[in-house]
């Protein structure tokens, strides 16, 4: 809980809608940096060939599309059981569930973007409820556009912020 009188120094809590709108816009901007290049790709569907194409365009590379091809996620293999996966276990489950959306890399990227957008919005919602937190520092950071759809780190960030909120409320 914040020290007495510090809320007056910070001012009133920001309204949630502008924070959510800004975070959503940044995530969608990140997807817009990557999706057109991904959809325009006409080369061989291998991780290396796609990476060469994506890296020729600033901001277009994403682990999401790379690992879809590298790990054959369109065939829905189970991370850690069917192939080695370098991300934490809950991320592996997230990646596996998202793989059932479609068998194309573009559809998988868009599905993952939608799920990551939901995680970003939940993170903003939780940050807004933590005493002393400044949710603008998350919702307005340009890094959200650059890294929000780079990989699945928003899952861990969202879970951490929810844990902090629950801890503050005494639900540890």
Locations of regions flagged by a protein language model:
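TM-lumen/periplasm interface segments of multi-pass membrane proteins
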Residues: 1-131
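Specific aromatic-rich, kink-prone transmembrane helix
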Residues: 156-172
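Short acidic/glycine- and proline-prone juxtamembrane loop motifs at membrane-interface regions
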Residues: 148-156
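Residue-level signature of the transmembrane alpha-helical core
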Residues: 114-117, 136-140, 162-163
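Transmembrane-helix signature of polytopic, membrane-embedded enzymes
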Residues: 124-144, 158
């Amino acid at each position: 809980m914040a020290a007495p009188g510090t809320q007056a120094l910070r001012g009133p809590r920001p309204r949630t809608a502008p924070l959510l709108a800004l975070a959503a816009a940044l995530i969608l901007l990140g997807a817009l940096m990557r999706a057109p290049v991904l959809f325009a790709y006409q080369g061989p569907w291998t991780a290396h060939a796609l990476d060469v194409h994506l890296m020729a365009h600033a901001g277009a590379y994403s682990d999401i599309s790379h690992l879809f091809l590298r790990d054959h996620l369109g065939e829905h293999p189970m991370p850690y059981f069917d192939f080695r996966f370098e991300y934490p276990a809950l991320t592996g489950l997230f990646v596996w569930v998202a793989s059932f959306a479609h068998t194309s890399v573009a559809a998988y990227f868009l599905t993952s973007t939608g799920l990551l957008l939901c995680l970003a919005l939940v993170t903003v919602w939780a940050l807004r409820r933590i005493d002393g937190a400044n949710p603008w520092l998350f919702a307005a950071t340009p890094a959200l556009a650059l890294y929000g759809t780079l990989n699945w780190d928003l899952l861990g960030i969202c879970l951490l912020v929810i844990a902090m909120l629950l801890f503050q409320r005494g639900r540890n």
